[in-house]
A protein has these predicted regions:
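Catalytic activation segment of kinase domains across protein kinase-like and atypical kinase folds
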Residues: 44-76
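Short histidine/acidic/glycine/proline-rich micro-motifs that form metal-
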Residues: 4-7, 66-67, 86-87
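Short, structured helix-loop boundary elements
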Residues: 13-17, 73, 91, 95
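A general structural-boundary detector
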Residues: 28, 63-67, 111
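An alpha-helical support segment within catalytic cores of ATP-dependent transferases
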Residues: 1-39, 47-52, 56-60, 142
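Alpha-helix N-cap/helix-start and coil->helix boundary motif
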Residues: 9, 13, 43, 66, ...
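Helix-rich C-terminal or lid/interface subdomains of diverse kinases
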Residues: 69, 77-145
Length: 145
């Protein structure tokens, strides 16, 4: 048994507890849905079949291991975040994706945005150092458009 010093002492611990409570309060206030959610819908899990001219014939989502029943807006927010992590600000793909979903489903963008801190916090648990800064920004955002 070896005792390890807790790096979350003092102010850091208070801030973490406050942020966690805020995220849990937000999560508990979100509507429950029964939609099929992929859980990891990103370019790596999409197979596009095209003809010789490059016309799309079929789009198939693969890797359904993270599939759940839940709120589709949470799944969309997660995909948006994955696209932002992959493409950063050098592509408009994340914005086009989330805007298309909102338009096709008559969902307010602000509602999908409410999920961003929650999915960012979930992603942060994967401990990928290269993602930490962006995820922290999404978690700390309070007001959305």
């Amino acid at each position: 048994y070896k005792r390890v010093a807790n790096p979350l002492n003092g102010v850091g611990r208070v801030l973490l507890v406050h942020r966690t409570k805020g995220l849990l309060t937000r999560l508990n206030s979100m509507k429950n849905h029964t939609k099929l959610c992929h859980g990891d819908y990103c370019p790596d899990n999409i197979i596009v079949t095209a003809d010789a001219k490059g016309n799309i014939k079929e789009i198939t989502a693969v890797d359904w291991v993270h599939a759940t029943q839940g709120n589709a807006s949470a799944d969309i927010a997660n995909t948006f975040l994955l696209l932002k992590l992959q493409f950063g600000d050098k592509s408009d793909i994340p914005e086009k994706y989330i805007n298309a979903f909102c338009e096709l489903t008559n969902t307010k963008r602000s509602y999908v945005n409410e999920w961003l801190p929650l999915v960012a916090a979930a992603r942060l648990t994967k401990n990928k150092e290269e993602e930490k800064e962006l995820l922290e920004q999404w978690i700390n955002v309070v007001d959305f458009q």
